Amino acid sequence: MKKTFLIITVILIGVFFASCSANRGFVSTVTRDDIQQLAQFEMYAHFGRVENGVSIIDNDSVTNTAKSLFETELAHDKTLPVTETIAISDNLVRNKVQDEIRWMRIYIDNNVPVKDITIPPTIDSILCSRNVRFGLLVHNGGFYCPDGIYKSPGSGIPIPFAHEGSTRSAIIIVDSKFKNLVYVATSNLKSNPLEAETYRKQIKDLLKEYRK
């Protein structure tokens, strides 16, 4: 069932007009050479679509397409040493992992010090049970605006967009040994979330510090 984005709508519009990119990199003593095995969790994705130039509505079709495009481009990139993909069949556990990824992105966006962000319990437990130290978490969200126009919820004044939407992505690598984050990168891009080129650009940006 479709639901209107509430506070999320305001956040997304604000992000759209913010800088196109933000990046960090390695945030612990771990280096690229230390990461020989990396387990990738299912990415968290959440997209909306502007309907009738008035509201951003949750849209499963946009979400699924954007998720598939990002995953395909990330797999083609080959920068990260992903050695396994973690598939979770238990819906309760899967939902917990998705929620933990979502909250980690919220902490990062709200400038919570990285040293104060610990690996979430469900993700940590899964990595430990597989005897894998490092886990890859991916977040992707935003909205699609097919008409290129959005009407402000308060005034109804049309706001023209130069692009057909916005994507907000993050790549986070966590360490189950020391229970912390080792790599954090975020990217906000004013671009169509239904085009593969959007994610080629975004992944290049997200991993530029990893490649150094």
Language model region names:
Residues 52-137, 184-186:
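N-terminal segment of the mature soluble domain
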Residues 1-4:
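Positively charged n-region of N-terminal signal peptides that target proteins for export
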Residues 20-49, 125-134, 139-212:
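C-terminal/domain-edge helix-coil "capping" segments
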Residues 6-11:
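Sec-dependent N-terminal signal peptides
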